[in-house]
Amino acid sequence: METAVILPPEFWHDGSVWIAEPEPSVESRALAVFARDELRVQDWCFFQTSGTEGARKWVGLTKQALLTSARAVNEHFGITAEDHWLLALPTHHVGGFGILARAHLSGSQVTQLAGKWNASAFVQKCAEVGTTVASLVPTQVFDLVAAKLRAPESMRSVLVGGGALNRELEAAALHLGWPIHCTYGMTETASGIAAQRLPGADMEVLPIWEVSADTEGVLSVRGEALAQGYAICTAGVWRWDAISANTGLRTRDRVEVLEVEGHSYIRFLGRQSGSVKILGELVALGPIQDQIESLKLGLGLHAADAAVCDVADLRKESSLVLAVSGMNSADASRLQKSLNETLRPFEHIHETRMLHAIPRSELGKVMLAELRALL
């Protein structure tokens, strides 16, 4: 069953503070008190960061920041009252909640896909309600491609964010008719920073943002939709870590920033925290994980899961391990062999470990800190 979703117009200026989570908790109630009594703020929303490493933080965004981001996305993709969203992301994540902000400004309809994510149910509902636009994460795109599900004729744009989409998966989705537009953003930027205007193109920086990369390629971003800061709770005590509007946010992402005919473009290279040293060489885990996802498709391992992770190595500083779940030892060996054929010699994986499940976030990101603990 699906439900129509809409926020009352007064939500955006009623002075309330909204805590984004699936169910109320002791922590969120304490955060609401902290926001009211200590921060003394109104018309703010708090979202937990969806990153794969580090301490849990609540990102404080003004409702105006969310609307500013939504307006920029609507303009970039030409979203109007004629469009119909199918909401397949949780609204307690900024990627899902941002859809409600875009719909509020554009007047477009929103239908929420009920129940646990299911690729076939998603396609069926798209066809039933005449969906024209949707936002997905790479794992959902993988499921659509693995099941060889074609896009309904009504679909004109599928915004893919929450993680990098590898080129092979993008090409396979486009071949099935899915009008994929890769996007790049984070909770701290109220969702989008950059997005493809056309499938397969570089991601164009939205005009509300100023971006730069330092000598190490680490991205800094500044703009009017930037978060105010982080609420952090340690041992029951809340503190506030502000983000400077003047200097902006130095992210942990490595990018290439391109300037072409007065427009800025971003190419995502990987997470700064997702790089390890092996025999003195810097190795980015993100591209290796992308290769794993591509190989799973090619080897027909659609129902299985796998992830690369670093472990301490006395001689090499770090070494790589392939963690797998839902596959037998023969399939794991095939995957390991195929993966090693794509890697540099010092990156080669010599050990595979079977797990009950690969720890992933609600949006499908591999949780590296939790995975390391299991290994």
Predicted segments with their positions:
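Conserved ATP/PPi-binding loop(s) of AMP-dependent carboxylate-activating enzymes
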Residues: 215-251, 271, 281-283, 287
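Conserved AMP-binding A3 loop
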Residues: 44-71, 78
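Active-site loops of AMP-binding adenylate-forming
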Residues: 186-204, 224-228, 232-237
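AMP-binding/adenylate-forming catalytic core of the ANL superfamily
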Residues: 246-347
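AMP-binding/adenylate-forming
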Residues: 61-71, 84-143, 181
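AMP-binding/adenylate-forming catalytic domain of the ANL superfamily
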Residues: 343-366
